[in-house]
Amino acid sequence: MSDKSSQLLAQQPIPAAFCRLAIPAVAAQLINVFYNLVDKMFIGHIPSVGKEALAGVGVTTPVILSISAFAALVSMGGAPKASILLGRGEVEKADRVVGTCTWMLLLLSLLLTIIMLAFGRPILLLFGASSKTIPFAATYMGVYCLGTAFTQLTLGLNAFITAQGKTLVSMGNVAAGALANIVLDALLINGIHMGVAGAAWASVVSQGVSACLVIRYLCSSRSDLRLRIRAVRFDGTLLWPCILLGTSPALMQLTENLVAISFNTSLQTYGGDIAVASMSILNSVMQFVMLLLPGLVQGAQPLLSYNLGARNIPRVKKTFRLLLLSCLAGSFLIWFLCMTTPGLVASIFTNNAALIAYTSWSMHIYLAMLLIYGIQVACQYSFVALDQAPTAIFLTIWRKIILLIPLIFLLPHIWPNPAMGVYLAEPIADTIAVCTTAPLFLRYYRSLG
């Protein structure tokens, strides 16, 4: 490992190292959100069909998130494993982890592409496409799936750059793809008038740009983790532990769709269109939370994993304490803004007075326990970074599948105001989850010595 990287992860004061790693990681999350918004702006302004085109592309979002979850399955377990091996000084074995994870990402890309080409239309109909939106959704997805390999390699392998403590490089790879996407959107949608197909091709090419940059870096001498052609092969002894560790982050992404469908279905029944619209605004607020907190976690992950491998336990503990304080501060800040100025927050997303009033009410309920959500994020993701796969998987299943989804459907039947009962599912699940996660992590923290 290069002296510069080793010094950053093993010797530099924790606050300075954490900031140096976390700021680019948060910036990368912000860039992703920004270019997704710009993408939708271009699509929404397609002459005469903008509304239907935007709705059609919106239907593809859960499918695209599901595809991305498979990259997380491989990389979010493989990257911490590789970082731990770097900390132990087992560089050759760490390179083999990169190789076998690349092999798996390529295999998943092939399988997902075949599935989407063969069954894309019925899958989109299952996710809510209508007779008006299915032509746009199918067109977009038909092109997008051709670039699945680029998406998998960009998301999957960029994590191995972050794992070295090179978050500025990984942010640059994301930024280059985002810039290419915006330029190509303008050219293909507004210039050549390719419509939704143009937006899809812009996404494919931009992901290709990012993938090339990621691969070039990992193959270069600047990278502490090297992608070597001879290592791109199946190695079950290395791959399966990575998959097990990555199961928790992948489940987090996959279950987001199920949670969203559950909320929308229940709110439509008990609150009508205004409740569903309000939920859309609340989800947008949570996007900002999930922009900040995972960025902080990505900054801490290399420090946690590398120093665990090096058995520098005091440094592991200091990193976690700083991560916990940062996540708590971030979640508290957003909670405070939402609790004190809910109308102002809602008005960012709509100018409808009735919807602003309703969202101000629902925001106080839905985000009531957001102030402690930072504990859940810091502990759960740290379990992944510290190679505690079974606990991380349990906590993911516990919060979303065992607690949240059943509560969404149960509480409306026992609460006087059924719609309020639906919104209450979130803070109740958050509270129980934190009360479970915090003691589990405290016990592990003490066991480190």
Regions found by a protein language model. Give the residues of each.
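Short alpha-helical transmembrane segments in multi-pass integral membrane proteins
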Residues: 1-24, 82-149, 191-247, 304-369, ...
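N-terminal transmembrane alpha-helices
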Residues: 10-41, 45-49, 62-81, 106-113, ...
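Residue-level signal for transmembrane alpha-helical positions in Major Facilitator Superfamily
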Residues: 19, 34-35, 74, 115-119, ...
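Transmembrane helical elements of multi-pass membrane transporters/channels
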Residues: 20-39, 143, 177, 206-210, ...
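Helix-terminus/linker motif at the lipid-water interface of multi-pass membrane proteins
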Residues: 30, 34-55, 124-131, 187-194, ...
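Small-residue hotspots at the loop-to-helix junctions and early N-terminal turns
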Residues: 51-62, 137-141, 200, 273-288, ...
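Small-residue-rich hydrophobic transmembrane alpha-helices
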Residues: 54-114, 151-170, 278-336, 340-342, ...
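Short runs within selected transmembrane alpha-helices of multi-pass transporters and secretion channels
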Residues: 144-162, 170-178, 199-214, 294-297, ...
